[in-house]
A protein has these predicted regions:
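Short, intrinsically disordered, charge-balanced linker/junction segments flanking boundaries
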Residues: 113-117
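N-terminal core-binding DNA-recognition domain of tyrosine site-specific recombinases/integrases
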Residues: 13, 25-112
Length: 117
């Protein structure tokens, strides 16, 4: 309880993205239908934590989000297929939701996903 409690009270969110995700999950999981949550959790695990995981929440800026967006837009499946615009928007919305939660409830100063657009 000690470390997590201290991390939850940190005003600059000086923890990594992957360390923040369990806090987000604990706060949000029960607010969605199970099928919706499973989709969100898959995106968080495979698209967000895999890219931003080791970065501190307070150090991620809009340029980092734009670099991630460019990587997602450039992704191709083994068959050469790109992610659809709707899926790319879904990915961005989930990233923005994580950062919005950090801003509203954990003292992060700004949402870099909202700034990146």
């Amino acid at each position: 309880m000690g470390t997590n409690f201290l991390q939850q009270k940190t005003s600059d969110l000086n923890m990594t993205f992957e360390d923040f995700v369990p806090l987000y999950i604990a706060d949000m999981k029960n607010r969605f239908k199970e099928s919706t949550w499973l989709t969100k959790e898959h995106i968080i695990r495979t698209k967000l934590v895999s890219y931003f995981g080791k970065r501190k929440m307070c150090d991620i800026c809009s340029k980092d989000v734009m670099a991630w967006q460019n990587e997602m837009m450039g992704h191709r499946s083994e068959a050469g297929k790109a992610y659809s615009p709707v899926y790319l928007k879904t990915l961005h919305n989930q990233l923005s939701a994580v950062f919005n939660h950090a801003v509203r409830h954990y003292g992060l100063k700004a949402n870099p996903a909202a700034q990146a657009g």
